Amino acid sequence: MAAGSAALIFSCASASAIESNYKASSTSSADTVWSKVGGFCGIANWHPAVAKCELSHGNKIRTLSLKGGGTIVERLLRWNNKGKNYTYMILSSPLPVTSYVSTIKVVAKGTGSEVGWTGKYKAKKGTSDADAKKVIDGIYKAGVDVLAQ
C-alpha cells in the first residue's frame, strides 16, 4: 500500500511538481556516511533543524519536533539498507508544501561517497513555487552538508 501511495502522489503531482535535489561529496566511505544517516529516526542526530524524533506505527511513522517550534509527521515508504537509501512522504507539517515525497541516498564515489536528498512536491496554496523550493532546498542543504562532513 505504501508504494501505491507514493505512485499515486507522483502521478497526481507530476504535471506541476516542483523538484529539489542537493548532493555533496564526502571523503568518508558510503558505509560510514550511511551509518550517520542511522535509522528512520536518525535524522534527529544529524539535521540541525530537528530537536527530537519519535517513531510509531511499527516504526513506519516518524514525528519530528523542530528546534524552532513545530512538528512534521512523515511516513516511511521504502527502506533499502543495502542500496543505502530510503523514501518517505510528509503527512503533516508547517512547511509550505503538499504532496511531498523524498529520498535520501548515499552512493560510493571512488574512495569516498556522495550523499543526496531529492524530492518532489507542490507549493501550498498562497505560496509561490519559488518560495516553496527555497525552503526545501535550504532543508536539504543543511542536512546533506552535515552528513557529508
Regions found by a protein language model. Name each.
Residues 28, 57-59, 83, 110:
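Residue-level signal for tight coil/turn positions that link beta-strands
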Residues 32-37, 43, 62, 76, ...:
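Hydrophobic pocket/interface hotspot
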Residues 28, 32-35, 42-45, 71, ...:
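Extracytoplasmic/secreted proteins, especially bacterial periplasmic and envelope-associated proteins
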Residues 67-114, 120-124:
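Hydrophobic-ligand binding "helix-grip"
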Residues 94, 114-116, 120-149:
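A conserved amphipathic terminal alpha-helix motif
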Residues 2-11:
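Bacterial N-terminal signal peptides
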Residues 20-22, 49, 60, 72, ...:
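Residue-level marker for the onset of beta-strands and adjacent loop->beta junctions
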Residues 10-56:
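Hydrophobic ligand-binding cavity/cleft-lining segments
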